């Protein structure tokens, strides 16, 4: 199989301000304090699934240098610069049409750059199973995460019929928007609702033909760009035509409309790390429930906090319960965890 991985890395991670900024968003930051940024961890978990020369990154023009620095093994021609943000459907089309130019039978995994996976061995097993399923078929597979709680922050995939040929794979009945708490609790009890991780697997022939049916405007634009890939005209063509794409997610453009959509439910310790609270739940905690990333953090009479600081700063905290304390460069945030939905407001 000619396997390829497309890493989507154009977001700005505004909910993780001040650690994540428009100049250096969270996918390029060592969020976990492990010595690797989230995009580096994303690439690492696909080692063994495909070689680095078959990995692709789609990102904003202003992050190209950061990607080159953090992922030097990925060829420069595989780092694709979006002239402007147009959501995930044009982002994915950009990568898949370019891959198809030199790899017409490529099997592709599309993944966000800023999620966390704990069990990388199980992750690879699941992804490789999906790749085998899509290699010689017109199927699209999405990885569904088995829910561990009634989560209101994720969209859901509803599984329908189990395949007779592979008991791990199901047809998809529907995609659901982020639910309220009562609905999320119902989903958890139903047993056939899975978190939408935004990880998709398909053959490049399949996605290009499906987009011609369900997202013809975007497909036509990339059909026009296609002859210019790998030529001196490529950058000019992208800058001229990419901004004319409709701004739409791959879920709305394709996944909710196409016919042969399947879900492969999985459990590999996935989190999209969308909030400070989610990060606190994944980091090691002291006996008082405090999670810390930094080299010199001292807490006194404090509990249930998350502290994230740059390496050279000494931080001393006394008497706080349930707070975010985050410092980067010349900015310090001190905010109640229960009020973290207001961080976008604070960062303006």
Map each language-model feature to its residues:
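Conserved N-terminal catalytic core of the sugar/cofactor nucleotidyltransferase
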Residues: 1-7, 15-22, 33-112, 118-128
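Short beta-strand segments
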Residues: 7-9, 58, 109-112, 142-146, ...
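Residue-level signal for inorganic ion chemistry
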Residues: 39, 95, 114, 157, ...
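Conserved core of the sugar-phosphate nucleotidyltransferase
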Residues: 120-242, 262, 312, 336
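Left-handed beta-helix
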Residues: 204-348
């Amino acid at each position: 199989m000619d396997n390829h991985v497309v890493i989507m890395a154009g977001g700005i991670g505004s909910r993780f301000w001040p650690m994540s900024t428009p100049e250096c968003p969270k996918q390029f930051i060592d969020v976990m304090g492990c010595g690797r940024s989230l995009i580096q961890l994303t690439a690492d978990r696909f080692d063994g699934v495909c070689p680095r020369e078959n990995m692709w990154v789609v990102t904003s023009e202003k992050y190209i240098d950061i990607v080159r620095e953090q992922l030097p093994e990925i060829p420069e021609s595989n780092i694709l610069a979006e002239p402007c943000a147009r959501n995930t459907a044009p982002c994915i089309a950009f990568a898949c049409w370019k891959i198809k130019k030199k790899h017409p039978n490529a099997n592709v995994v599309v993944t966000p750059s800023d999620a966390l996976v704990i069990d990388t061995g199980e992750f690879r097993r699941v992804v490789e199973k999906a790749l085998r399923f899509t290699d010689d078929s017109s199927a699209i597979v999405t990885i569904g995460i088995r829910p561990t709680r009634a989560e209101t922050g994720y969209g859901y995939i509803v599984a329908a019929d189990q395949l007779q040929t592979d008991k791990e794979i199901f047809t998809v009945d529907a995609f659901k928007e982020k639910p309220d708490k009562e609905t999320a609790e119902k989903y958890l009890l139903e047993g056939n609702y899975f978190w939408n991780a935004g990880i998709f697997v398909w053959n490049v022939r399949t996605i290009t033909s499906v987009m011609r049916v369900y997202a013809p405007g975007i497909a036509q634009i990339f059909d026009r760009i296609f002859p210019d890939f790998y030529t001196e005209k490529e950058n000019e063509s992208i800058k001229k035509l990419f901004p004319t794409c409709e701004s739409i997610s791959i879920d709305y453009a394709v996944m909710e409309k196409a016919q042969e959509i399947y879900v492969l439910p999985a459990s590999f310790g996935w989190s999209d790390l969308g909030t400070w609270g989610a990060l606190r739940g994944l980091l090691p905690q002291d006996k008082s429930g405090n999670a810390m990333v930094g080299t010199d953090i001292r807490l006194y009479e404090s509990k249930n906090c998350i502290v994230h600081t740059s390496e050279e700063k000494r931080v001393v905290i006394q008497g706080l319960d349930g707070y975010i304390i985050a410092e980067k460069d010349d900015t310090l945030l001190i905010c109640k965890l229960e009020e973290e939905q207001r961080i976008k407001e604070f960062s303006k």
